[in-house]
């Protein structure tokens, strides 16, 4: 069950309040700071080429966005949710990221960080939205971070683009089974930050890059078919770090 960041376009809209920053290794950051809701895209087109060699550099760029654009360092009580199915490689980004977290809730440390992976409704019989809402009532976080893999319409963004949004996530929207939006209003938190990386692309979108008419028609005949890179397992392992 795939999800897309709610109302977050593959290309951020041009705006006087949109800022773009370029870094080494072809990394670029586009920000939409219009209004109260902030969005950002960190595009790392060379990630699949350089891999672990630029891991530390990419981490620093991402940390900069989290701290300076989204101000998460001000949060004292943080709930981190790893969305997705750990048993499916292209949907396991959320749960795998949680494996690398330092959980401090109950240790008298600040900030207090707790984490959980709700799995998917097809495995649990419980809607993800309902699970997160109930956990949020128990924890009472001022910041909820939702980490997920999702679908994209652009081949160039596969496993190489980090998208941030304060709008929340509608679980299942990537495959037309969307439920209620997991937002700060629904969870009663001061802020909800969604972090997503595309690991799948629709066959119809992929077909736009194919010149062979017959093959293109075959892909277009399965509009809801989703494809992922053959090395998606390696990419998810790298991104989750």
Regions found by a protein language model. Give the residues of each.
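Helix-enriched interaction subdomains in cytosolic or periplasmic regions
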Residues: 34-59
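A glycine- and small-aliphatic-rich helix-loop capping segment at beta-alpha/alpha-beta transitions
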Residues: 65, 89-106, 161-170
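Gly/Ser/Thr-rich loops at beta-strand to alpha-helix junctions
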Residues: 82-93, 122-123, 149-153
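Catalytic-core regions of hydrolytic enzymes
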Residues: 112-144, 149
């Amino acid at each position: 069950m795939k999800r897309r960041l709610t109302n977050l376009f593959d290309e951020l809209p041009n705006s006087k309040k949109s800022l773009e920053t370029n870094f080494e290794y072809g990394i670029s950051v586009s920000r939409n700071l219009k209004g109260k809701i902030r969005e950002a895209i960190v595009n790392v087109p060379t990630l699949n080429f350089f891999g672990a060699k630029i891991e530390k550099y990419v981490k620093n760029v991402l940390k900069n966005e989290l701290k300076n654009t989204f101000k998460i360092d001000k949060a004292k009580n943080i709930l981190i949710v790893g969305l997705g199915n750990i048993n499916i490689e292209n949907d396991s980004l959320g749960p795998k990221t949680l494996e690398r977290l330092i959980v401090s809730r109950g240790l008298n440390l600040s900030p207090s960080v707790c984490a959980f992976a709700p799995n998917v409704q097809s495995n649990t019989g419980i809607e993800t939205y309902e699970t997160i809402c109930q956990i949020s009532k128990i924890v009472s976080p001022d910041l909820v971070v939702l980490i997920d893999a999702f679908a994209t319409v652009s081949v160039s963004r596969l496993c190489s683009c980090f998208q941030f949004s304060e709008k929340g996530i509608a679980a299942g929207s990537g495959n037309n089974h969307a439920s209620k939006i997991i937002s700060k209003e629904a969870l009663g938190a001061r802020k909800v930050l969604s972090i997503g990386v595309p690991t799948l692309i629709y066959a119809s979108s992929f077909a736009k890059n194919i010149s062979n008419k017959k093959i293109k028609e075959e892909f277009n005949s399965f509009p809801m078919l989703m494809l992922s890179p053959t090395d998606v397992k390696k990419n998810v392992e790298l991104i989750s770090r």
